[in-house]
Amino acid sequence: VIVLGLSTSTPTGSAALWGPDGLLAEERYDALELHAEQLLVGVDGLVRRAGLRPSHLGAIACDVGPGSFTGIRVAVAASEGIAAGLGVPRFGVASLEALAAAAAAGARPVIALLDAKKSEAYVGEFERGEAAGPFEHLDLAVARARAERCLARGGVAVGDVLHALLGLELPSGASILRPDAAWIARMGRSRAVSGCPTQPL
């Protein structure tokens, strides 16, 4: 199964193709200026550059946030259109979930944080790859305390607010900043091949 992943929940958007042997192709966009029609054109070019046809796609995976409402709406609209046109399933993957997966932390706890503007952050905490609770929308001071607590436990912190907004110095290797379509596609493929039911985006 080859899966198309879309992520436009942050200013840096991306699209990627993930197959049985891993990443096939990836492209990045300025999500602040992106419209669904432009994303569809970009996806068509991405598929062609990978030497594929749209009919080769077996599922679509989309970043469903939290993040930019406008950006998420663009990716969801594009994914719904592509999935409906091809008659393939679509899967939603949370932006914080993709960030945590990219940290490749193994058994260590992970906290993922994304800029929510207005001195706030979207926060998700994970234990052994699973969400430890619901995602939260927190004041930066509270988010910082959560991140420091996770790091004190030997955990990993990822996200675009860690240094610029929270002033935290990151441990070596913790450079994951934003959700990436490659991870969205990878996680979507895992759900597709395991027979997970699709859900409304």
Question: Model-derived features: where do they sit?
Answer:
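A general structural signal for well-ordered alpha-helical segments in protein cores
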Residues: 36, 40, 79, 96, ...
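N-terminal beta-alpha supersecondary unit
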Residues: 1-66
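Generic hydrophobic alpha-helical segments
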Residues: 39, 43-46, 50, 96-100, ...
